[in-house]
């Protein structure tokens, strides 16, 4: 992959990971039941960005973990903060575990791209 495109992809995935952190923030709000309508609106926006950006990342780099289906299942299952706040503890922990698995998978992809970036930088000199 061209060095400039690799740099752009790394920045894109870093930004994507920040959105995943925001998603986790909203999970915390749902768990504590401390959220309002604006939080609900922002949660929907974060989910939209996560779904759209996933497609852009998939078009640029191949990976199997996390799978598109896993990401869509998590986003689709988290319909609203109100819904999440009503989940029993076991179901909520399962949701958090799904989030963590996806987040770690994305971090791994980012790490692999940074290795490529370093190798590309070394070969360019």
Predicted regions and their residues:
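Conserved non-transmembrane functional hotspots
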Residues: 1-125
């Amino acid at each position: 992959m061209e060095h400039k495109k690799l740099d752009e992809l790394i920045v894109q995935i870093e930004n994507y990971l920040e959105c995943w952190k925001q998603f986790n923030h909203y999970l915390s709000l749902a768990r504590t039941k401390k959220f309002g309508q604006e939080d609900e609106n922002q949660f929907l926006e974060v989910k939209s960005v996560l779904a759209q950006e996933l497609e852009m990342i998939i078009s640029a780099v191949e990976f199997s973990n996390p799978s598109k289906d896993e990401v869509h299942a998590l986003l689709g299952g988290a319909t609203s903060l109100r819904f999440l706040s009503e989940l029993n503890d076991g179901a909520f922990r399962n949701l958090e575990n799904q989030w963590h698995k996806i987040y770690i998978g994305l971090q791994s992809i980012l790490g692999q791209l940074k290795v490529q970036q370093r190798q590309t930088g070394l070969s360019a000199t």
